[in-house]
A protein has these predicted regions:
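Cytoplasmic-side transmembrane-helix entry/capping segments in multi-pass membrane proteins
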Residues: 91-100, 121-123, 144-148
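A membrane-interface helix-boundary motif in multi-pass transporters
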Residues: 90-96, 189-208
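Short, Lys/Arg-rich, polar N-terminal cytosolic tail immediately upstream
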Residues: 1-12
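C-terminal ends and interior cores of transmembrane alpha-helices
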Residues: 103-117, 217-221
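Hydrophobic/small/kink-forming positions within alpha-helical transmembrane segments
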Residues: 73-77, 181-189
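Central cavity-lining transmembrane alpha-helices of secondary-active solute carriers
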Residues: 66-81
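Helix-to-loop junctions at the C-terminal end of transmembrane segments
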Residues: 77-90, 195
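Small-residue-rich hydrophobic segments that form or flank transmembrane alpha-helices
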Residues: 10-60, 131, 135-175
Length: 225
């Protein structure tokens, strides 16, 4: 049971999270810029556009934004099922199993042509949802690795508390949240460059980033064991 505790802590480390957050920003830029202006992570934006087209009577365009929303819900459901069935595995942590599944799915997306954008966006949204459900803390602080508004609120709140209390631990918390936002922005910028130069296959860099997190978790587990 002690080994499980260390693994959970490692999944919350900033080093592990950094590559996952970069991957998340990349995925959002990729689907928006390369796959028909649909968001992989920002489901609020998809819901707004889905409703706008729906009320305008453009059913086909509305469905284009509804599908990733439904896929996102399915991804959360799938991640929780994996957690419940495999949380006591000894050799491979259940979070690492999810990362492997994400890598396989995103790698397949890189082969899909523009004509399959709806399916590609659904797969990427599914992967993003699995990440949201699986990696929910960094340095012990709850965060969203794919959406910035919650991190902006938490970071600014912590910064305000620091100005009143001068508690350095609270300052560290604020900087962690703003660091997450910065990493996401860098990932989005990287996604824009890759979409321009590698087109559909740019998503493969996201696979590489996730693979780094996967192996970091292995290395650190061996050090703690």
């Amino acid at each position: 049971m002690k080994l499980h505790k260390h693994r959970g802590q490692m999944s919350e480390s900033l080093l592990t999270a950094a590559f996952i957050i970069l991957s998340g920003g990349l995925q959002d830029a990729y689907t928006y810029l390369c796959r028909g202006k649909v968001f992989a992570n920002a489901q609020t934006g998809n819901i707004v556009l889905c409703s706008a087209y729906l009320f305008d009577g453009q059913w086909r365009h509305s469905a284009r934004y509804l599908i990733p929303v439904l896929s996102f819900l399915l991804g959360i459901f799938a991640a929780e099922c994996i957690h419940r069935h495999f949380k006591y595995m000894e050799k491979v942590h259940w979070r690492q199993m999810i990362i492997l599944a994400e890598i396989a799915l995103l790698f397949a997306v890189g082969f899909l042509p523009q004509e399959a954008n709806t399916f590609a966006n659904a797969v990427v949204s599914f992967v993003c949802a699995m990440q949201v459900q699986t990696f929910r803390k960094v340095r012990g602080h709850a965060y969203a690795r794919t959406m910035c508004i919650g991190n902006m609120r938490s970071g600014t709140e912590a910064l305000c508390v620091y100005f009143h209390t001068h508690d350095r631990e609270v300052l560290c918390k604020a900087l962690t949240y703003f660091g997450v936002i910065g990493l996401f922005a860098i990932g989005a910028g990287l996604g824009a460059l890759l979409s321009a130069h590698m087109a559909e296959r740019g998503i493969w860099v996201s696979c590489a980033l996730l693979a780094v997190s996967f192996f970091i978790m292995f290395i650190r587990e061996e050090e703690k064991a």
